[in-house]
Amino acid sequence: MRVSLAALAFLLTLAVLHSEANEEPAGNMRVCCFSSVTRKIPLSLVKNYERTGDKCPQEAVIFQTRSGRSICANPGQAWVQKYIEYLDQMSK
């Protein structure tokens, strides 16, 4: 019984150490989008944007609104590309 408890404790410790080693640093964490808006959102509501990370199942742009909401959008849509260009110019 003591051997099995020791083995279990050892395995749990290994699992925790392994999961911590595979995590990305907090500064590199990105949010993934699983759905995106289909309608254009008003540009006046948008403060900035970021792209989803490489590990996400689908590519998306995440717009941050002035009220603090995050809205996912399809980067292939023309209005999304125009918003990105505008926001990039404003940040220069």
UniProtKB/Swiss-Prot annotation:
Q: Using the UniProt record, give the first listed, main subcellular location.
A: secreted
Q: Which cysteines are cross-linked by disulfides?
A: 32-56, 33-72
Keyword Signal applies? yes
Query: Which keywords belong to this entry?
Result: Chemotaxis, Cytokine, Disulfide bond, Heparin-binding, Inflammatory response, Secreted, Signal
Instruction: Please tell me in which tissues this protein is expressed.
Output: Plasma serum.
> Per the UniProt entry, what are the Gene Ontology biological process annotations, in alphabetical order?
antimicrobial humoral immune response mediated by antimicrobial peptide; chemokine-mediated signaling pathway; eosinophil chemotaxis; inflammatory response; positive regulation of cell migration
Intracellular or extracellular location(s): Secreted
One Gene Ontology term, aspect cellular component: extracellular space
Which residues span the membrane?
Answer: none
Signal peptide region: 1-21
What SMART domains does this protein map onto?
SCY (SM00199)
In its UniProt record, a GO molecular function of this protein is:
chemokine activity
Classification via SUPFAM superfamilies? Interleukin 8-like chemokines (SSF54117)
> In the UniProt record, does the keyword Transcription occur?
no
The entry sums up its family as follows: Belongs to the intercrine beta (chemokine CC) family.
Q: What does this protein do?
A: Chemotactic activity for neutrophils and lymphocytes. Binds to heparin.
PANTHER family given in the database record: REGAKINE-1 (PTHR12015:SF149), SMALL INDUCIBLE CYTOKINE A (PTHR12015)
Name-wise, this protein is Regakine-1
Originating species: Bos taurus
